[in-house]
From Swiss-Prot:
Gene Ontology terms: biological process: DNA-templated transcription elongation; regulation of DNA-templated transcription elongation
NCBIfam families on file: greA, PRK00226.1-2, PRK00226.1-4
PROSITE patterns per the UniProt record, alphabetical: GREAB_2
Keyword Ribosomal protein: no
Family statement drawn from the similarity comment of this UniProt entry: Belongs to the GreA/GreB family.
Protein name: Transcription elongation factor GreA
Example of a GO MF term: RNA polymerase binding
Species annotation: Christiangramia forsetii (strain DSM 17595 / CGMCC 1.15422 / KT0803) (Gramella forsetii)
Function field: Necessary for efficient RNA polymerase transcription elongation past template-encoded arresting sites. The arresting sites in DNA have the property of trapping a certain fraction of elongating RNA polymerases that pass through, resulting in locked ternary complexes. Cleavage of the nascent transcript by cleavage factors such as GreA or GreB allows the resumption of elongation from the new 3'terminus. GreA releases sequences of 2 to 3 nucleotides.
Amino acid sequence: MSKVSYYTPEGLKKLRDELNHLKDVERPKASEAIGEARDKGDLSENAEYDAAKEAQGLLEMKISKMEEVVANARVIDESQLDTSKVLVHSHVKIKNQTNGAEMTYKLVAQSEADLKSGKISVDSPIGKGLLGKKVGDTAEIEVPNGTVKFDVIEIWRE
């Protein structure tokens, strides 16, 4: 059974657009590369043909995985979410107890994660540690160099 993932409407559209690009642009390119390599003669010693077939296999595997993700994707109506605790698509402001640094993140699905824009995956260590927390709670998060404690300062939705 595949895992259900939750997306914003924009995130799901981006995922579908990428899948359509793979099917409509990359798949025909892979077939064309195989055809060109096949036209070069003996297939038993044709490294170009072997490479093109392998690339096509990897592309088909990627398409298959993306189709599964899209099939199990659910769009979240952010206006209906509980703002009293951290959930997927929550914005959360946290404070590191060790150094006092404050950070703001939005928890999103793995495929929407982008640390530069402040979007972290709900499957990341920080994301997992924050899920279900309320304002005033302390999240203890295991990181490679130990445990970090964060205070939840604020939770909101856009």
